[in-house]
A protein has these predicted regions:
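Structural recognition of the beta-strand scaffold that forms the well-ordered cores
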Residues: 89-92, 109-113, 155-159, 179-182, ...
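A short, structured surface patch at a secondary-structure boundary
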Residues: 54, 58, 63-149, 155-161
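Sec-dependent bacterial lipoprotein signal peptides
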Residues: 1-15
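Extracytoplasmic ligand-binding site segments that recognize negatively charged/polar headgroups
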Residues: 88, 96-98, 113-124, 164-167, ...
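Bacterial Sec-exported substrate-binding components of ABC uptake systems
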Residues: 17-98, 209-236, 360-373
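Alpha-helical, coiled-coil/dimerization segments enriched in small aliphatic residues
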Residues: 246-280
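Structured C-terminal subdomain patch of bacterial secreted/periplasmic proteins
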Residues: 187-205, 209-215, 296-373
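Short helices/loops that flank or line small-molecule/ion binding pockets
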Residues: 142-153, 282-293
């Protein structure tokens, strides 16, 4: 899409991780030729450089993907982290990155996990750990450095939780393990979240696979884009143990999914400029006022766990008995696997569309929604 005039990055300091030990001839400077086209994602960019190099920028942090057989430019800005292909033995801490990597056939590049086997809802990831192909190397705040170093880890993929323990990031980098902090959860559009598959395609040399996977995902919901809104309203929520309702902000990707499915999110006007969180806790009284007349209730099981019956829901919040959706029997619970299955968001959109357009869809035919009876 957009193309930038070629220019050379200025030389500041030699990067600490510059490939001094690489035998291939080095180029002196990095020349940007174009901007890699992204249709939806806003939280990362990729500059395509001469010689097959790719310069990734995420929230001000820069990463240079160096093709196999090449070396990093000699005069490279000191803030740029070098990622030498093939990138192998990845320590994958951000669980939402696993599904895109699996979808492009890149699971073999992952050697270490920040999630234990029993906590994976992705069959391929769980099986790989059970078979010893991927080892548990500790969660983001307490990594097993010995395991990570013995595995010759080529990259740690973290999410922004790592900023709560910056000393861990610093220690990994001190040991020579580059750290990439992904921000897909900050994307406000479901298609933007899925487009992060292209970043993993670039890292793993599987760009064509990533583009094909993303295009297929977009095509799955393409028929809905020509449909008229259904007029149905919906709330997406959970009830906390301290009697608050957790709802998504109006600009969140879940609200966008409800819209793509033909519905209208009842808290579309809810904003909170005080933080970057996608969710906000509101009082049950405020939830009652905003969602009592919603046509559909969608209970988010990710945090508080799955519900199986209407009685379980009413036990958590008896006042829901007054809600229109409860009385009409249009209350649905998401599966707990939803967060990890980040490339399957089109299926949730299609599920929602069936709930909005059919009187009583068979939940055995839905992927992520189960009806509460």
């Amino acid at each position: 899409m957009r193309r930038a005039a070629a220019f050379a990055l200025p030389a500041l300091l030699l990067a600490g991780c510059a490939a001094a030990s690489q035998t291939p001839a080095q180029t002196d400077a990095l020349t940007i030729e174009s901007r890699y086209p992204l249709e939806y994602a806003k939280q990362f960019t990729v500059d395509v450089c001469a010689g097959g190099y790719d310069l990734i920028t995420i929230d001000g942090s820069r990463y240079l993907v160096v093709p196999e057989g090449a070396a990093a430019p000699a005069n490279l800005d000191a803030d740029i982290t070098v990622l030498q292909q093939p990138i192998q033995n990845i320590y994958l801490v951000s669980s939402s990155a696993m599904d895109p990597i699996i979808s492009i056939g890149g699971l073999g590049a992952v050697a270490l996990s920040g999630t234990q086997a029993e906590n994976w809802y992705l069959d391929a990831a769980r099986t790989a750990m059970e078979q010893g192909e991927i080892a548990y190397a500790g969660k983001y705040s307490a990594p097993d450095y010995e395991t990570i170093l013995s595995a010759d880890c080529g990259l740690a993929i973290e999410n922004t939780m790592i900023y709560h323990t910056p000393e861990v990031k610093e220690q990994l980098e001190k040991f020579g393990v580059p750290v990439l902090v992904e921000r897909s959860s900050y994307e406000s559009d479901p298609l933007a979240r899925m487009e992060w598959v292209k970043l993993y395609g670039i890292l793993l040399g599987r760009t064509e696979e990533a583009e094909r996977v993303f295009d297929d995902a977009v095509q799955r919901i393409a028929p809905l884009l020509d449909e008229e809104p259904t007029g149905k309203t919906a709330a997406f929520f959970s009830i906390t143990s301290n009697n608050l309702a957790t709802v998504r902000k109006g600009g969140d990707y879940v609200a966008k999914m409800i819209g793509l499915a033909g519905g209208s999110y009842v808290f579309a006007d809810l904003t909170d400029s005080g933080n970057n969180l996608a969710t906000v806790n509101i009082s049950l009284e405020d939830f009652y006022a905003g969602a009592r007349d919603a046509d559909v209730l969608l209970y988010n099981s990710t945090i508080e766990g799955e519900l199986r019956t209407m009685d379980e829901l009413l036990a958590k919040c008896p006042m829901l008995a007054d809600f229109k959706a409860v009385q009409s029997g249009s209350v649905w619970c998401t599966s707990q696997s939803l967060f990890q299955q980040s490339m399957e968001l089109p299926e949730l959109i299609l599920d929602m569309n069936r709930v909005f357009t059919e009187d009583d869809p068979d939940d055995s035919e839905l992927t992520f929604l189960t009806k509460l009876h």
